[in-house]
C-alpha cells in the first residue's frame, strides 16, 4: 500500500515548509486516487485529437514535479517508462518533495528560484498546475466510462472498502 492511500497525518507544527509539504501530501493523495486501477486501455483515452490523453497528463505531471525537484535538488531523476512505473515514480517523486519541503526553514525556502523567480510562483504555478491536471485525469476517466473511486480529499480517507 502506498503512503498516499490515505492522507498522511497533519504536521504537528505550522511552518512555511510544512504548509508546502501538506500541499504536496494532498497532491499525492489526489494523484493516487485519480490514477488508481487505471487500465492501459483507458489511459490512452482523449476526448479529441487536440486534447492530452490521461497518460499524457500523467507524463506532464511528472515533468512539472521534476521541474520543482530540480529547483531544490541538483540531481536529476529519470522519467519512468510505461504507465504503471510512471504512476509509481510520480508518487515517489511527490513523497521526496514532500519530505524535502517539510524540513525547510524560511531562509531555505526564500532561496529557491524557479525560472529566476522567488519562491511564490512555485505555489501559483507548477503546484497549482499539477492539481489542475489531476482534475483533468479524473474528468477524462469519467468521460471514458471508468470514473475514479470515491475517496474523501477533505478527510484524506480512501473509498469505502479500499
Predicted feature residues:
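Short glycine/proline-rich turn/loop motifs
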Residues: 9-13
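Second-shell loop/turn segments in exported
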Residues: 14-21, 80-84
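Extracellular-facing binding/remodeling surfaces
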Residues: 36-42, 103-104
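Helix-adjacent hinge/juxtasegments
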Residues: 67-100
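Long, well-ordered core segments of solenoidal/helical folds
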Residues: 98-102, 160-162
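Acidic catalytic patch
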Residues: 101-116
Amino acid at each position: 500500500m502506498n503512503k498516499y492511500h490515505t492522507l498522511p497525518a497533519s504536521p504537528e507544527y505550522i511552518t512555511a515548509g510544512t504548509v508546502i509539504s501538506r500541499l504536496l501530501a494532498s497532491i499525492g493523495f489526489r494523484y493516487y486516487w485519480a490514477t488508481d486501477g487505471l487500465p492501459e486501455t483507458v489511459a490512452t483515452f482523449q476526448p479529441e485529437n487536440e486534447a492530452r490523453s490521461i497518460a499524457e497528463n500523467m507524463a506532464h505531471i511528472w515533468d512539472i514535479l521534476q521541474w520543482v525537484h530540480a529547483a531544490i535538488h541538483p540531481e536529476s531523476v529519470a522519467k519512468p517508462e510505461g504507465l504503471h512505473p510512471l504512476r509509481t515514480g510520480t508518487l515517489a517523486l511527490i513523497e521526496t518533495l514532500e519530505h524535502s519541503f517539510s524540513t525547510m526553514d524560511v531562509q531555505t525556502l526564500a532561496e529557491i528560484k524557479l525560472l529566476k523567480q522567488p519562491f511564490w510562483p512555485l505555489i501559483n504555478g507548477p503546484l497549482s498546475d499539477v492539481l489542475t491536471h489531476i482534475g483533468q485525469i479524473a474528468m477524462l476517466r469519467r468521460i471514458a466510462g471508468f470514473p475514479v473511486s470515491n475517496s474523501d480529499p477533505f478527510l484524506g480517507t480512501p473509498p469505502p472498502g479500499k
